[in-house]
From Swiss-Prot:
InterPro entries reported for this sequence: Aldolase_TIM, PdxS/SNZ, PdxS/SNZ_N, RibuloseP-bd_barrel
Protein name: Pyridoxal 5'-phosphate synthase subunit PdxS
Name of the gene this protein is made from: pdxS
Keyword Zinc in record: no
Function: Catalyzes the formation of pyridoxal 5'-phosphate from ribose 5-phosphate (RBP), glyceraldehyde 3-phosphate (G3P) and ammonia. The ammonia is provided by the PdxT subunit. Can also use ribulose 5-phosphate and dihydroxyacetone phosphate as substrates, resulting from enzyme-catalyzed isomerization of RBP and G3P, respectively.
Amino acid sequence: MTNVTGTERVKRGMAEMQKGGVIMDVINAEQAKIAEEAGAVAVMALERVPADIRAAGGVSRMADPTIVEEVMGAVSIPVMAKCRIGHLVEARVLESLGVDYIDESEVLTPADEVYHLNKRDYTVPFVCGCRDIGEAARRIAEGASMLRTKGEPGTGNIVEAVRHMRQVNAEIRQVASLREDELMTYAKNTGAPYEVLLEIKRLGRLPVVNFAAGGVATPADAALMMQLGADGVFVGSGIFKSENPERFARAIVEATTHYEDYELIASLSKGLGNAMKGIEISTLLPEQRMQERGW
């Protein structure tokens, strides 16, 4: 790695390069190739997609490095991998493998209930989830180079991702309308670092990209999130838990790109087969709600 690799500017720039694209969860080289051929801008290598993690229960950890290396060897697009919240060693292991991004993810069982990782200590860029501007600003202050809505992973239900995207964007507008001398009180009330809020106010947006994630299951879901202001889309279980993964993958990529072309989205949605089985959020017990992990 060069001396400039790992700087905030470089890491944020790497994340910007994925803007407008779809990032797909994969569990092996075959799925990674399907994702790449469908037009994914990156893949997330893991042992089980969120729907299977949810169904299995128990403790979910970093993927076997063999799987990560297998995926890295199969595709030319960037490869991401997940570590547990606060797990210093899992993050270092993934960095040593040469992954392009690390997702400090609430999909896995948190390793630390007090501290997230100091992502500025790593040369590899990090992705983190958020539900509101407080969470977004705290992750940015820790060094996250890309954000995503938490949604409710593995449910095939878009409602929580919609809620989180609308919440963050509404709060960005609120911050932009505040006087600078009002920001400190807002920072206190939201737990958002003042310096990050100041940057958001001056830019009128988050200083890093914010993708949609957690519940995207159809081309229409992807287009909806783009219309709500997402910079791109993560699809976890929605591709390979569908009836026809290859067709769903291509359709979601196309819908993400052409999210205001309703005739095209209608065409893409015809004859796709069944989407992944969905879960109503109200049926989840509090301990089953992955979005509650992290702080």
